[in-house]
Each structure stands twice: as C-alpha cells, then as structure tokens.
Regions:
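Hydrophobic alpha-helical transmembrane segments in multi-pass membrane proteins
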Residues: 23-59, 98-127, 135-152, 188-218
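Membrane-interface segments at transmembrane-helix boundaries
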Residues: 1-16, 53-115, 119-132, 155-185, ...
Length: 246
C-alpha cells in the first residue's frame, strides 16, 4: 500500500501526462460557471439542483475513466475531445446503478437524522424549552453527519468493484466495499483532508482552481482504491508508445 505522499505524487504525474487534468477538469469548470451564472437568479432555483446532479454524474464518470486508465482497460487519446468522450463513455449501466444506490443510501444516513433533528430543535424552540427535546435534536444532527461520513467511506470502492464485477448484485457490491474498506476509512479521510488548502484555493478563485484540483483529488482517490483492491497495474507508468493517436 502506497503512502499518502506517494499516491498524491502519482496523481499529479498522471494528470500531467497528455494534459489529462484539462480533460477531467474542463467539464467541472463548465458546470461551476453555469451554476454561478444562475446563482443570483431567483427564477432559476431548479438549475442549482440540476447542476448538482450533473456534477455527481461527472465525478462518477471521471473516477471510472481514471480507473480504466490505471487498470489498462483504456489508453489515453491525444485529442481533448476524444478524452472527454472516453471519460463519459467509461460509465456503464452497472456502475451507474451502483452510484445511484450508494448516493441514495448515504443520503438517507445523512438527511433522515438531520430532518428529525431539525424538527425536534424547532419543536423545542417553539415550546420555549431547551431540555431533552432540544439536545436530542442536536445529537441527531451530529449523529447524521458522523454516520453519513462513515457510510461514504465504507462504500468508496463500490463503483470500482461494479466496473470489474458485472455479475455481482448491487447490495453485494456495497457489502464487498464495506468489507474491503475495513482499516482504510480513516486513511482515506486523512488523504482527503490533506486537500483542505487546495479547497480553500478553489473557493477563493470562485471555482476556477477546480480545473486542476478536482482532477487531482479524483485521481488520488482512484489510485487509493486500486491500492486497496490490490490492482498493481497502477504502479506501471504509461509510456508514450502505449498511447493511441486520434
């Protein structure tokens, strides 16, 4: 298992080859700019929800594309348009359904305790009481965030397992991911936390820095997944002679 520093170094090198960072980051930047364009338009409230959904779909496709490259299932094309096309082409019906299920289940863990907690807090405030009801609501808010985060990391491998195990059922994939992530959840959390300052940079630039940071983070997380899954092909650097010319 590579160290966090080795994984991040490999991720940087990978997205630098053939300007892969541009192919991965450009769709994300377009989504950010469209979202900003409608951010102050009250009549376009549904646009933000649509952009959020498209962003999740983009991240799913980008992660699978990086995974395909790492596992030698896909060679990197020369042209930008071909790279972007290949990225969205990495999505399969099985990985899409797996991604939906993961999103639904983790969403339930996050939002059900949150909604109930908010309800209890509002009820406590209306009744002008800061007793058990109020603190139970606060506890549910904290519980929802904590357990939702754990579930997010437990199912972090599900889409990659779906890519390589088309015969496995959706819940079997989640169970397998949960099993394989034992002992690795905190490591991945710390790795993601190490991008904190990059995240601030993205915020400070209105999302523009995400053109580079988003591919960097996605590549690092996908490399981490290949390490946990024991896919050693990710250790072999791609050679210019291996690339298809389009």
């Amino acid at each position: 298992m590579k160290s966090r520093q080795e994984i991040k170094k490999q991720a940087k090198q990978m997205i630098a080859e053939d300007n892969l960072w541009l192919a991965l980051g450009l769709p994300c930047l377009v989504l950010v700019l469209v979202n900003l364009a409608f951010a102050f338009n009250e009549s376009a409230t549904g646009v933000s929800s649509a952009i959020s959904g498209l962003t999740l779909l983009y991240e799913l496709c980008a992660s699978l594309y990086v995974f395909d490259i790492l596992t030698k299932q896909h060679l990197v094309g020369k042209q930008l348009g071909r790279k972007i096309s290949d990225m969205f082409g990495s999505l399969t019906a099985h990985t899409f359904k797996t991604g939906l299920l993961v999103g639904f289940i983790t969403g339930l863990w996050f939002f059900l305790p949150y909604i109930i907690g908010i309800g209890l807090i509002v009820a406590a405030l209306v009744s002008n009481s800061f007793g058990i009801l109020f603190w139970l609501g606060v506890a549910l808010l904290l519980f929802g965030g904590f357990i939702g985060l754990i579930k997010t990391y437990e199912y972090a491998l599900a889409i990659y397992l779906a890519k390589t195990n088309e015969e496995l059922g959706l819940f079997a994939l989640l169970k397998e991911s949960k099993q394989k992530m034992k002992g690795h959840k905190l490591t991945l959390f710390v790795q993601n936390l190490s991008f904190f300052w990059w995240g601030l940079g993205v915020f400070a630039t209105g999302g523009l820095l995400g053109l580079y940071v988003t591919p960097y983070v996605l590549a690092a997380n996908t490399i981490f997944a290949t390490e946990v899954l024991g896919i050693n092909d990710s250790e072999n650097p791609r050679k210019e002679s291996d690339l298809e010319v389009f």
